[in-house]
C-alpha cells in the first residue's frame, strides 16, 4: 500500500477517513493540520516521508512543543502495519482496540470472532500481541507515558503537560512553577484490574479538556499521598456473586469513563472526610471544587459504601456524621456565604409534581359577574416541630439551606419589621422565618405558594390564574385600583387628575405584567392573589427604596393588609398568610409548629385542640401604628378605629397581654394536605440521617450488630 493510500484517523472519534476527505465522515470534525513539532523552526533533513522520525534529529536538538501521538506523527510503514496487525477494529464504531480487549472501549460492543477490517494475519492472534520494536516516537504513546512522566511539568493554569526544557506553558504562556510535580490519578497499571490502558488514556484526555478553565491543585504532596485509592473502591465493589459483578460491570465502566479530574478529587475528599484525611479536602479546595457539591447516585454507587455515603450528602454532611470537628470548621467557613439551598420541594420531585397537579385541580372559576378564580383548599405551610429534636449542628445546616439569611437579617436587624415583639416571638412561639426562593420576578407567586403549599410556582399555574382573573374581572379590579391610587396620591398632598386614556394605559401595563413569566408584580397583583386564595395576605416590608449607596429613593408601598374585599365574607377564610418584602424581593414568612394555645389574648376565646398551631401575626408595626389596609373604597375609608373594625370582620383578631393587636393564623398537621405532610417528612428525613455517629467508625459496626 502506498503512502497516498493511507487513511487519516480523526482525532475525536478515531474513524479512519480516506486521504481526500477534509472532514471526518462520522463526526464532521475538521481534518487536523500539520502538528507543531519543535519550539524553533527547523529544516527537514530529508523529504522522504518513509524515514523514521527522530526527535534528536531536529535542528539544534530542540524538544518537541506538543507531544505527537499515534495519529498526528508521521506514519512509518512498518510500524503502521504492525499496529493494525495487533489491534482489532470495532464493527460498530471502527475504534481500534487492543488485542486482549473483549469489548470495544468506546461503545462496549462485543468483539466479533473475525472483524471485517481485520487482516488475515491478525484474526487469529487476539490472545497475545505480536512483539515489535518500538520506534523513537513510541515513547510518547499512552502506554509509555508513565516512564517519561518526570520529563514533563504540568501547567497550574490549563493543566497542559509541557516538556522539562520549556520555561513557560506552550498553551497559555504561564511561567513554569518551582514545583513541577503533577497530580495524576489512576495512571499506574496496578490501580485497577478493570480499567485498561485505553480507558486511562481517554480519561486523562477528558481531564485536560474538561478542566481547562479550572486551576489544578498546587499541592506539594507526592502522587502516592493524594491520589484516589481506587483499589479500595474496586475491592469493595467486588463483594457479591460473579453474576452481579457482570451485570454491574458495564454500568460502572460507563460511570468511570464520564468521570473527570474534579470528580475524582471530590470522591477523594469524601473518603478523606470519612477517614480523617485533611489533605484530600485541601486538594479538592485548591482545584476550585464546590464545597457544597452533593453526591450523586452514580458517585455513591462507585464508592460502594452505603453505611458511609448516601445520595445528596455533601462534605459538611459527612463531617457532621463522622464528628470531624476540625474539618467541619474549615468546611463551614467555606460555605457560610454560599450555602447550597435545599427546600422541601427540591427533595422529592415526584411529590412536588403531584402537589402542583392538586393545585391546578383545586383552581375553579366562579360563575356570575365576578368571574374570579379561587382555590378550594385551605393549606398553610409551617416548619415541623421535629427540627428542634435535631442536634444543633444539623439544625444550623438545615436553616442555612431552607432560609434566606439575608432577608431574615434585613427584616429583623436592619429594621424591626418582623419578630420585634419579644412576647410574640418567644412566649407565644410566633417567630417568623423567611424561606428562600427564586430571585426572579416570580418571587411573589413563589412566596404565596410556599406560604400555603410549600412549593414554587414552577409551571406558572398561579400566574395564569392571576392573569385570567385580572382579565375576566377587569372592571371590578380596575375600579378599586383607580380609587386607591387617587386616594393614595392625595394623602401625600399630590393633587392631580389624569385623563381616562392615561388610566387605561397604566391599567394595560398592569395586565401585561401578569401575563409575562418572570415579570415583577405590583400591589394590585397581591390584591388579586388574596381573592384567588380567598384569605387575607399580610405583607411586612421595608418602607423605602434605597440605592446601592443607601440613599432613600422613595416609598415602597407594599407593607400592609390585603383583604379579599370583592368576595362575600362567608366565602373566605380568616386565617391569613404572611409575606416579607425587601428591596424588590418577596419571601414567604412561616412559623414553626407549636402545641396551640388556649386563651393567650385579651378577650380572645380560642377553642382549639392540641394539634392546631396558632401563629400570632401583628397588625401593627414596631411603633404600634396600625398597618394600612390596601384598596379600600371611598365608603370603607375612615379613621384608624374604622379600619381596625374592618380588620376584625375579615380576620380572627385578638389583643395580647402586652397590648399588641394580632391576627391568628391557624394550621394543623393532621388536617393539612397529606401530600404536603409527606413532602415535609421526606425533607426532614434527609437531616435525620446525618446525625453524628456515636462510634468513631463509619457506622458499619452498628449495622453488623443489628444484622446479628
UniProtKB/Swiss-Prot annotation:
E.C. designation(s): 3.4.19.12
InterPro entries: AnkUBD, OTU_Deubiquitinase, OTU_dom, Znf_RanBP2, Znf_RanBP2_sf, ZRANB1_OTU
Family matches, as PROSITE patterns: OTU, ZF_RANBP2_1, ZF_RANBP2_2
SMART domains cross-referenced by the UniProt entry: ZnF_RBZ (SM00547)
Binding site residues for Zn(2+) 3: 155, 158, 169, 172
GO CC annotation: cytoplasm; nucleus
UniProt source species: Bos taurus (Bovine)
Location relative to the cell: Cytoplasm; Nucleus
GO molecular function terms listed in the Swiss-Prot or TrEMBL record: cysteine-type deubiquitinase activity; K63-linked polyubiquitin modification-dependent protein binding; zinc ion binding
Renumbered ranges of ANK repeats: 260-290, 313-340
Domain OTU, chain residue ranges per copy: 432-592
Catalytic activity: Thiol-dependent hydrolysis of ester, thioester, amide, peptide and isopeptide bonds formed by the C-terminal Gly of ubiquitin (a 76-residue protein attached to proteins as an intracellular targeting signal)
Protein name per Swiss-Prot or TrEMBL: Ubiquitin thioesterase ZRANB1
UniProt entry tagged with the keyword Flavoprotein: no
Gene it is expressed from: ZRANB1
Keywords associated with the record: ANK repeat, Cytoplasm, Hydrolase, Metal-binding, Nucleus, Protease, Repeat, Thiol protease, Ubl conjugation pathway, Wnt signaling pathway, Zinc, Zinc-finger
Gene Ontology terms: biological process: cell migration; cytoskeleton organization; positive regulation of Wnt signaling pathway; protein deubiquitination involved in ubiquitin-dependent protein catabolic process; protein K29-linked deubiquitination; protein K33-linked deubiquitination; protein K63-linked deubiquitination; regulation of cell morphogenesis
Sequence ranges of Polar residues compositional bias: 206-216
Subunit description: Interacts with TRAF6. Interacts with APC.
Amino acid at each position: 500500500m502506498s503512502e497516498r493510500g493511507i487513511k487519516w484517523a480523526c482525532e475525536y472519534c478515531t474513524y479512519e477517513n480516506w486521504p481526500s476527505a477534509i472532514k471526518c465522515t462520522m463526526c464532521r470534525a475538521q481534518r487536523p493540520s500539520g502538528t507543531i513539532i519543535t519550539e524553533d523552526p527547523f529544516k527537514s533533513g530529508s523529504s522522504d516521508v518513509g524515514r523514521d522520525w527522530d526527535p534528536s534529529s531536529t535542528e539544534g536538538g530542540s524538544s518537541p512543543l506538543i507531544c505527537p501521538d499515534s495519529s498526528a506523527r508521521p506514519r512509518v510503514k512498518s510500524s503502521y502495519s504492525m499496529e493494525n496487525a495487533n489491534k482489532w477494529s470495532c464493527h460498530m464504531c471502527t475504534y481500534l482496540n487492543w488485542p486482549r480487549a473483549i469489548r470495544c472501549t468506546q461503545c462496549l460492543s462485543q468483539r466479533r470472532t473475525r472483524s471485517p477490517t481485520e487482516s488475515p494475519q491478525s484474526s487469529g492472534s487476539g490472545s497475545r500481541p505480536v512483539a515489535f520494536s518500538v520506534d523513537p516516537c513510541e515513547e510518547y504513546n499512552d502506554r509509555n507515558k508513565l516512564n517519561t512522566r518526570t520529563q514533563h511539568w504540568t501547567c497550574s493554569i490549563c493543566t497542559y503537560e509541557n516538556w522539562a526544557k520549556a520555561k513557560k506553558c506552550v498553551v497559555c504562556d504561564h511561567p513554569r512553577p518551582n514545583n513541577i510535580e503533577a497530580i495524576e490519578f489512576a495512571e499506574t497499571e496496578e490501580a485497577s484490574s478493570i480499567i485498561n490502558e485505553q480507558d486511562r488514556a481517554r480519561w486523562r484526555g477528558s481531564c485536560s479538556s474538561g478542566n481547562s478553565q479550572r486551576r489544578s491543585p498546587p499541592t506539594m504532596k507526592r502522587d502516592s499521598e493524594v491520589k484516589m485509592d481506587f483499589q479500595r473502591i474496586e475491592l469493595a465493589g467486588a463483594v457479591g456473586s460473579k453474576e452481579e459483578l457482570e451485570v454491574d460491570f458495564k454500568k460502572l465502566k460507563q460511570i468511570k469513563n464520564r468521570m473527570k479530574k474534579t470528580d475524582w478529587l471530590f470522591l477523594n475528599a469524601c473518603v478523606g472526610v470519612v477517614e480523617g484525611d485533611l489533605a484530600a479536602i485541601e486538594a479538592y479546595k485548591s482545584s476550585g471544587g464546590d464545597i457544597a457539591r452533593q453526591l450523586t447516585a452514580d458517585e455513591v454507587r462507585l464508592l460502594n459504601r452505603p453505611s458511609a455515603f448516601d445520595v445528596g450528602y455533601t462534605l459538611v454532611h459527612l463531617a457532621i456524621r463522622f464528628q470531624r470537628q476540625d474539618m467541619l470548621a474549615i468546611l463551614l467557613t467555606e460555605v457560610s456565604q454560599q450555602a447550597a439551598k435545599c427546600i422541601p420541594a427540591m427533595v422529592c420531585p415526584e411529590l412536588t409534581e403531584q402537589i402542583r397537579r392538586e393545585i391546578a385541580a383545586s383552581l375553579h372559576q366562579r360563575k356570575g359577574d365576578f368571574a374570579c378564580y379561587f382555590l378550594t383548599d385551605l393549606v398553610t405551610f409551617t416548619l415541623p416541630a421535629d427540627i428542634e429534636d435535631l442536634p444543633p449542628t444539623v439544625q444550623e445546616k438545615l436553616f442555612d439551606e431552607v432560609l434566606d439569611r439575608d432577608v431574615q437579617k434585613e427584616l429583623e436587624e436592619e429594621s424591626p419589621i418582623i419578630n420585634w415583639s419579644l412576647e410574640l416571638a418567644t412566649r407565644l412561639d410566633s417567630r417568623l422565618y423567611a424561606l428562600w426562593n427564586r430571585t426572579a420576578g416570580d418571587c411573589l407567586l413563589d412566596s404565596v405558594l410556599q406560604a400555603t403549599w410549600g412549593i414554587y410556582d414552577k409551571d406558572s399555574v398561579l400566574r395564569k390564574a392571576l392573569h385570567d382573573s385580572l382579565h375576566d374581572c377587569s372592571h371590578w379590579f380596575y375600579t378599586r385600583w383607580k380609587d386607591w391610587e387617587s386616594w393614595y396620591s392625595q394623602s401625600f398632598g399630590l393633587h392631580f387628575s389624569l385623563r381616562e386614556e392615561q388610566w387605561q394605559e397604566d391599567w394595560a401595563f398592569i395586565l401585561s405584567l401578569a401575563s409575562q413569566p418572570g415579570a415583577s408584580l405590583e400591589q394590585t397583583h397581591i390584591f388579586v392573589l388574596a381573592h384567588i386564595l380567598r384569605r387575607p395576605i399580610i405583607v411586612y416590608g421595608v418602607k423605602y427604596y434605597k440605592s446601592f449607596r443607601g440613599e432613600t429613593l422613595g416609598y415602597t408601598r407594599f407593607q400592609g393588609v390585603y383583604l379579599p374585599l370583592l368576595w362575600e365574607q362567608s366565602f373566605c377564610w380568616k386565617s391569613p398568610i404572611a409575606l416579607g418584602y425587601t428591596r424588590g424581593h418577596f419571601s414567604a414568612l412561616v412559623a414553626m409548629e407549636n402545641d396551640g394555645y388556649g386563651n393567650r389574648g385579651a378577650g380572645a376565646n380560642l377553642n382549639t385542640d392540641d394539634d392546631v398551631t396558632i401563629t400570632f401575626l401583628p397588625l401593627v408595626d414596631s411603633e404600634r401604628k396600625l398597618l394600612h389596609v390596601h384598596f379600600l373604597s371611598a365608603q370603607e375609608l375612615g379613621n384608624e378605629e374604622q379600619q381596625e373594625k374592618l380588620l376584625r370582620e375579615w380576620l380572627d383578631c385578638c389583643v395580647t397581654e402586652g397590648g399588641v393587636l394580632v391576627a391568628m393564623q391557624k394550621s394543623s398537621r393532621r388536617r393539612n394536605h397529606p401530600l404536603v405532610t409527606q413532602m415535609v417528612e421526606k425533607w426532614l428525613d434527609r437531616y435525620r440521617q446525618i446525625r453524628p455517629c456515636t462510634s468513631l467508625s463509619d457506622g458499619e459496626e452498628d449495622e453488623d450488630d443489628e444484622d446479628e
